[in-house]
Structures are given as C-alpha cells and as structure tokens.
C-alpha cells in the first residue's frame, strides 16, 4: 500500500482562527500565528485558481484517492455535462493544457516563437518545469483548504457542544426560576399573613393599653375615694364624740336645773308648811332629800359611764358611724330604763286611782310629779325606739347628718303650780 505523497514546503498564507481566540495549542499548526509567519508563494502564470461554483477537490483525505482505482466508475450526470463539466476519470486535456493552446493565445504564441527561435529542447524543459510548479501549488492549496475545513469542522463541533451545554443550562435555569417563583409566592403569602397578624396584635395592644390606662385612672380615683372616706370617717367620729358629749352634758345640766328648780320651789313653801294642818315627820323629808341626792349622783355616774362606754366602743370596735350612733342610743335607753325601773311600776301607777285621790300637798304632790316624769320619759324612750328602727332601716343613708338630740326634759312641776294650797299648821 502506498503512503501519502510527499508534501512540499508549507506556506502559511492565513492566520489561525484558534490562535486569534487564544485557544490554539498545536505545535505544528499549518496556519500563521501572526503576520510575521505569513508567506506568499511566488506568482506563476499557470497557477490553478479556484472558481466559484465548482467543487473543491483539494480538501479531504488521500485514502479516497489512493483507493479510487478500486471503486466503481461514476455515472455521467447529464446536468453537469450540459453545463460543460466533465468527470475526472474522463477528463482530457483542454486547449489550455495542449500544445495547440499556446498557438491560439497571443501571449503564448509570442513566447513559443521566441522559444522556437532559441532552442526546441529548452522550450520543452521550461514547459515541464512550469507544469510541475503548477501541480505543487495545487497540492499546497488542497492541503491548506483541507486543514481549514478540519479546523472549521472542529470549531463547529465545539460550537454545537457549547450550544447543547447552554441549552442544558437554560433548562436548569428555567427549573430553578420556577422553583424560585414558587418560593416567592409562598414567602409573599407568609408575609401577608404576618402583616395581618401584626395588625391584629397592634389593635390588641392598643386596646390593652387603653384598658390599662382606664384601670390606672380608676385605681387612682379609688385611692382618692378611700382617702376621702377615711377623712370623712375620722371627721364623723369626732362629730359623734362631740354629739355624745353634748347630749350627756345637756342631760346633766337639765337634771341639775330641775333639781335646783325643785329646791327653789320648795323653799318658798317652807313658811307655808307651818300653816299646814297635816303634820309630816322629819324622817320622811329626810328620805325625800336622800332620794333626790341619790338621783343626782346617779346622773353624774351615768354621764361618766356614757363617756367610758363611748371610749371603750371606739377602742374595741372599728365600725361605721351609724353603728356607733345606734350603740349610743341603745345605751341611753338602757340607762333610762334602769333608772326608772320596770315598766310595770309605771303601768300600775297609771291605773291606780291615787293620782286623783291624793291631795296636792306634801309627799303626794311629789309622788304625782315623779309619776308624770316617768310618763314623759317613757314617751321619750318610745321616740328613741322609733329612731332606732328608722336607723336600722335607713343604713344606706348619708352618715354625715348629725343625730337629733333627745327632747329636753320639761319641768314636771309647772302644771301643778296653781294647784298648791296653803294650809295653816297649828
């Protein structure tokens, strides 16, 4: 098997495209790596020029040419023959390649004449040299065009691979973009939910702050009201103490004044007693005086007792002023009851006929006076009981209203001033 034909000197007439991109790593590259490596072949008249529209057979592998003799003959193409093209295996030398062609061309004709004049052998040798040069140039052009085609094919393959890789990247990026869009939608929905929740929390916080402010204001008012209640309670306690002391003082003064009036009324009758006809024993008068003194001492001790009870009640109990006033009224009523004794005695005195039978002189008059005083005190106690019941029913009323003092004891002796009779005592 024959090897590839020998190549002539390589002329680098074009720049390497890979070198221009910066990717050419071949040491024996058939293209120029710079303008300095470009070499132009010498111009020759018989050089083969490539015509546009014709098939370029310079590129390709030599194995096809070597084994071409064993391949079947190509069929004739009527279209190509009509255009004036002939197949390679049936190709004959044209008028340009034949000797007659030189005679038809004026330039060749002059050269031929000149060559014929000199030497016929020299003309044949020069013609053979020119043909060999043309063949070498054709081979070089074929080799250079084949290398360029290979380079272009490699570049095309690389571009296709790059395009496929870019398409794969594009699909991956589209998938990633879809995933990111879904994530953005989810995040936007979460953000909307969080915004709604934040608005609700803000509204709830606003309501809670307003409620807290209202509660703080109400608590401050409650504390102020408590302080005012304490101050009013202390003031009411002082007023109750003053009222109780005034009542006790007034009762003591009235009883003392009644005793003095009794003594003053009895003193002008001492002279008239001498004229009385009914004798009285001194022991009975002494008993009456003793009884008056005991009553006076009883009133004094009762006032002291009232004061001690009030102080004890203030110390032991921390109730309201209404309960204190009720307690004081109850004490007054019990003391008055103990002073007068049982109500049975008063009823007996009311039903007894002694009131009309006894004379209005001496001890009988004093007994009637005591009876009237007892009746008046009983009426007064009934009014006190009514007040107690009203206070029990009206506990919710204002405690700042002062208690009404008990009615002043009227002088029981004024109604009997005109009934006194003068009696001559022998």
Curated annotation (Swiss-Prot):
C3H1-type zinc finger segments: 10-36
Entry keyword Coiled coil: yes
An MF annotation (GO) of this entry: DNA binding
Domain of life: Eukaryota
Biased composition (Basic and acidic residues): 54-70, 78-101, 108-120, 135-155, 284-317
Gene3D superfamilies named in the record: Zinc finger, CCCH-type
InterPro entries: Znf_C3H13/40, Znf_CCCH, Znf_CCCH_sf
Bias (Low complexity): 124-133
Annotated region (Disordered), positions in chain: 34-155, 253-317, 390-426
Keyword Ligase: no
Biased composition (Polar residues): 255-272
Alphabetical UniProt keywords: Coiled coil, DNA-binding, Metal-binding, Zinc, Zinc-finger
Entry coiled-coil feature ranges: 144-245
Compositionally biased region (Acidic residues): 416-426
PANTHER family linked: ZINC FINGER CCCH DOMAIN-CONTAINING PROTEIN 13, ZINC FINGER CCCH DOMAIN-CONTAINING PROTEIN 40
The protein's name: Zinc finger CCCH domain-containing protein 13
Organism of provenance: Oryza sativa subsp. japonica (Rice)
């Amino acid at each position: 098997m024959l090897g590839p034909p020998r190549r002539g000197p390589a002329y680098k007439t074009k720049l390497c495209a890979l070198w221009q991109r910066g990717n050419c790593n071949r040491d024996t590259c058939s293209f120029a790596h710079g303008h300095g490596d470009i070499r132009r072949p010498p111009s020759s008249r018989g050089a083969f020029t490539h015509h546009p529209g014709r098939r370029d057979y310079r590129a390709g592998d030599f194995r096809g040419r070597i084994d071409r003799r064993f391949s079947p003959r190509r069929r004739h193409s009527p279209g190509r023959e009509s255009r004036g093209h002939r197949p390679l295996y049936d190709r004959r030398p044209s008028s340009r390649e034949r000797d007659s062609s030189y005679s038809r061309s004026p330039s060749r004709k002059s050269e031929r004449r000149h060559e014929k004049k000199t030497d016929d052998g020299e003309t044949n040798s020069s013609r053979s040299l020119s043909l060999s040069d043309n063949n070498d140039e054709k081979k070089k052009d074929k080799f250079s065009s084949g290398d360029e085609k290979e380079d272009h094919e490699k570049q095309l393959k690389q571009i296709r691979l790059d395009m496929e890789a870019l398409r794969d990247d594009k699909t991956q990026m589209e998938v990633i973009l879809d995933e990111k869009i879904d994530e953005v939608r989810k995040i936007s929905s979460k953000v909307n939910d969080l915004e709604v929740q934040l608005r609700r929390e803000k509204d709830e916080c606003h309501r809670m702050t307003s409620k807290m402010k209202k509660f703080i204001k109400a608590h401050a008012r409650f504390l102020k009201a408590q302080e005012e209640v304490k101050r009013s309670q202390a003031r009411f306690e002082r007023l109750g103490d003053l009222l109780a002391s005034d009542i006790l003082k007034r009762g003591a003064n009235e009883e003392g004044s009644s005793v003095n009036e009794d003594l003053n009324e009895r003193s002008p009758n001492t002279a008239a007693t001498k004229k009385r006809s009914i004798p009285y024993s001194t022991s009975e008068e002494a008993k009456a005086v003793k009884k008056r003194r005991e009553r006076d001492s009883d009133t004094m001790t009762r006032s002291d007792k009232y004061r001690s009870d009030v102080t004890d009640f203030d110390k032991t109990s921390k109730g309201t002023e209404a309960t204190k006033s009720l307690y004081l009224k109850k004490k007054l009523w019990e003391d008055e009851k103990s002073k007068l004794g049982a109500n049975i005695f008063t009823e007996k005195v009311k039903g007894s006929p002694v009131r009309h039978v006894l004379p209005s002189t001496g001890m009988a008059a004093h007994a009637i006076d005591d009876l009237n005083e007892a009746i008046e005190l009983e009426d007064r106690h009934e009014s006190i009981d009514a007040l107690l019941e009203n206070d029990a029913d009206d506990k919710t009323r204002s405690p700042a209203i002062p208690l009404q003092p008990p009615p002043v004891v009227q002088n029981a002796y004024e109604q009997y001033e005109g009934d006194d009779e003068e009696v001559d005592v022998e």
